[in-house]
Amino acid sequence: MGKKQHIAIFTTASLPWLTGTAVNPLFRAAYLSKDGERDVTLVIPWLSLKDQALVYPNNITFASPSEHEKYIRQWLEERVGFTSGFSIKFYPGKFSRDKRSILAVGDISEVIPDKEADIAVLEEPEHLTWFHHGKRWKTKFRLVIGIIHTNYLEYVKREKNGQMQAFLLKYLNNWVVGIYCHKVIRLSAATQDYSGSIVCNVHGVNPKFLEIGKKKREQQQNGDQAFTKGAYFIGKMVWSKGYKELLHLFKNHQKELSALEVDLFGSGEDSDEVQKAAKKLEMAVRVHPARDHADALFHDYKLFLNPSTTDVVCTTTAEALAMGKIVVCANHCSNEFFKQFPNCWTFDESKGFVQLILKALAEEPAQLTDAQRHDLSWEAATERFLKAAELDKPFEKKLSRSTSIYMSTSLNLQQTVDDASAYVHHVASGFEISRRMFGAIPGSLKPDEELSKELGLSDSGRK
């Protein structure tokens, strides 16, 4: 038997912040390590108490990394139903208020000792490497796989001078991802394109949603009415997360949809404005605070509406399908993966949106087969990841005799270009002035005394 693969998964966020880059890499680590064939380490940011208070909900904070790890493992075990065998390590991070995200401090690749460095998975590689100053990822690890979660270009386009910012960011992202990743997996075609990248949804749904869907299927098979409620939408309550499109569609088709009752669930900076807009409609649209999508409150809804085109792969759409519901969503590349499921109905224009809603109200959802349910699971997502990353076969680097000289010369030239490019980035990321120019948090070149003490870093690690 060959040597076990050691996979280190680096990500940009952590529970209890329920964002995609906190939740999905955690499930990935659990399912990659489930069969015991790989050694898996999840590497997540550690924040000072001050930053924890800004990021984590419900006043949850942790006095130590061990306390934080205990919380994460308990949360995970409650959802997957098995004890995970992966390890958790922390890297120093700081919260950027203006970017609303956590940025790494220092060389986070040092968290994995050189003797253990084998395969690195960078969840949001552009985010993790914008300001990276340290050992080159491709040098330290045999294989570096980047997973693109977010379309940062769409976010910056909404800011002041957005078009120019997006233009510059596109080239910065291409630069750092090319320098630091061997392979790039994009969750959908709604992300920025990268040279040599492949599109593959390597995410699954929380097993709880599949259990809910299984019970609903049993009710349908027994002839019971499984879905007694109408339509709903759930998501962070900001206009860009689908609320703008949804309320616009309702406003333009109030007469046709007069019999429809819709519940909107979410919290966010646009909550008050969404509520005001909903009240102006001549149809029943109720606005509620955010709730966990697995809450029993949602089980009996038949129809999930999601006209958003700003997601890369919408988690709530996957969850609704797993629960056996009909989903009406936009015919958009972010929903391409979901089109294989019989309950995913897509529309191109507002007329189609109305027709699908009326059809859904008159029909019952199709019962998902076991194979379709499997495709939504983390087991299937893990299979897709291993195949896309080519980790399901032995690692080999062989050149045929006829092409070896040409290929060797070509690879050497490419290596020289990559090395030069990496050197330029290393130099630029080593000066406070240039780091600040590109948006780094002041003083993030190395961990401060507080972070070093909390993580038990040596003085040499801070130099």
From Swiss-Prot:
**Subcellular localization, as worded in the UniProt entry:** Plastid, Chloroplast outer membrane; Plastid outer membrane
Top-rank taxon of the source lineage equals Eukaryota
Q: What is its main location?
A: plastid
GO molecular function terms attached to this record: digalactosyldiacylglycerol synthase activity
Leader sequence range is: 1-22
Q: What is its EC number?
A: 2.4.1.241
A biological process from GO: galactolipid biosynthetic process
The top EC class is transferase
Q: Which Pfam families match?
A: Glycos_transf_1 (PF00534)
Instruction: Give the record's GO CC terms.
Output: chloroplast outer membrane
Gene3D superfamilies on file = Glycogen Phosphorylase B
Annotated S-S bridges: none
Q: Which InterPro entries match?
A: DGDG1/2 (IPR044525), Glyco_trans_1 (IPR001296)
Q: Which SUPFAM superfamilies match?
A: UDP-Glycosyltransferase/glycogen phosphorylase
Q: Which PANTHER family match?
A: DIGALACTOSYLDIACYLGLYCEROL SYNTHASE 2, CHLOROPLASTIC
Q: Which family does it belong to?
A: Belongs to the glycosyltransferase group 1 family. Glycosyltransferase 4 subfamily.
User: What is the stated purpose of this protein?
Assistant: Involved in the synthesis of diacylglycerol galactolipids that are specifically found in thylakoid and in nodule peribacteroid membranes. Specific for alpha-glycosidic linkages.
Q: What is this protein called?
A: Digalactosyldiacylglycerol synthase 2, chloroplastic
Which source organism does the UniProt entry give?
Lotus japonicus (Lotus corniculatus var. japonicus)
